[in-house]
Regions:
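PAS-family sensory domain signal
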Residues: 17-69
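PAS/Per-ARNT-Sim sensory domains
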Residues: 58-86, 93-94
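Generic recognition of flexible, low-complexity loop/linker segments
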Residues: 15-19, 29, 86-88, 98-100, ...
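Short loop/turn elements at sensory-signaling interfaces that couple input to output
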Residues: 111-138
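PAS-associated C-terminal cap
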Residues: 1-14, 132-157
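PAS-family sensory domains
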Residues: 99-107
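Primarily the dimerization/phosphotransfer
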Residues: 23, 147-173
């Protein structure tokens, strides 16, 4: 009996260490039951914990969090992404779905649903919801995209100038 208790304690300790390690990467982790429209917080930043609490109804709390946390231009995308009533279908042939969004603070995040459990028919019943800060990568990506756009514009201008020069030269000759 004592060995069984020690083994159980060792398993719990290992699970806590795993959650702690993953929580360094994701600022929020929820376990969600799609059948009962419920979630349970595994780990979250204090501001989100205050907003959503330890557990609740997905349809209610995720709507409240989205309305208060997501930038206006990403509201519709996130309403669709966070819609738990369509999630099982979206995950039918996949193990995860994700999207990027900007918070009202201006910080970029990536949200992801990961399949945790399927029923005997293969339908998704439970998922993990995780989100992480991708602000540095997103800003770098946007800056690179802008630099590429500028370079392409400059190349186009140079090409037009060269074409115009050659046209005038051939006309003069």
């Amino acid at each position: 009996k004592k060995q069984q208790m020690e083994a159980t304690m060792a398993d719990l300790k290992m699970n806590n260490e795993i959650i702690s390690a993953i929580s360094k990467m994701y600022w929020i982790i929820y376990r969600m039951d799609l059948i009962h429209d419920t979630y349970e917080e595994i780990s979250s930043k204090e501001f989100m914990h205050r907003l959503t609490g330890r557990s609740g109804k997905i349809s209610v709390q995720f709507t409240k969090a989205r309305e208060r946390f997501i930038a206006p231009e990403f509201q519709e995308r996130m309403r669709e992404f966070l819609d738990a009533s369509t999630l099982a279908e979206r995950l039918k042939n996949r193990e995860e779905v994700s999207t990027e969004y900007r918070a009202i603070t201006g910080v970029w995040h990536q949200a992801r649903f990961i399949v945790k459990l399927r029923n005997e028919a293969g339908e998704v019943t439970n998922v993990l919801y995780v989100a992480r800060d991708i602000n540095d990568q997103k800003i770098s990506e946007l800056e690179s995209r802008e630099e590429l756009r500028r370079t392409a514009q400059e190349a186009e201008k140079a090409n037009l100038a060269k074409t115009d020069f050659l046209r005038r030269m051939s006309h003069d000759v």
